[in-house]
Amino acid sequence: SRSPPEGYNTIYLLDYQHRKAIDYPELLVIAGNEENSTVSVWVVVENHMGSNQSYQLLQKVVRGSILSFPVEADAEQSYIKTLRDGEKWEILATVSLNEPGSYSVVFELWVYDADTEAFVFSYNYCVLNIDAIERT
């Protein structure tokens, strides 16, 4: 007899307005001396591990390209939640950029490991590439 398939976690992005996997923000116009210029996306985490699981979502912003994961950068935002098996967690993530340039916004999914009593990187992540330009 075959054993059941191993459980998994998943993370994906949805656009802010329609909550669909299309029309992600790619360009941000920085508005002079007004408030911070921001973009928002929905980050969705799903638990298909067969049991309750605690997750940590780290939001990081880096200039330019990413060479490896997890990204060597401090998290701008951190979210923690325990999900039941089959449960979905939707986080509205907002990113503020004030300097022109090319950015990678990274959402890393970390999973709680009871043996080490720490969150470990799941190797599941999403990257949103955004070019920020100044209003002319």
Model-identified regions with their sequence ranges:
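Short aromatic-acidic-glycine turn motif
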Residues: 3-22, 61-73, 114-119
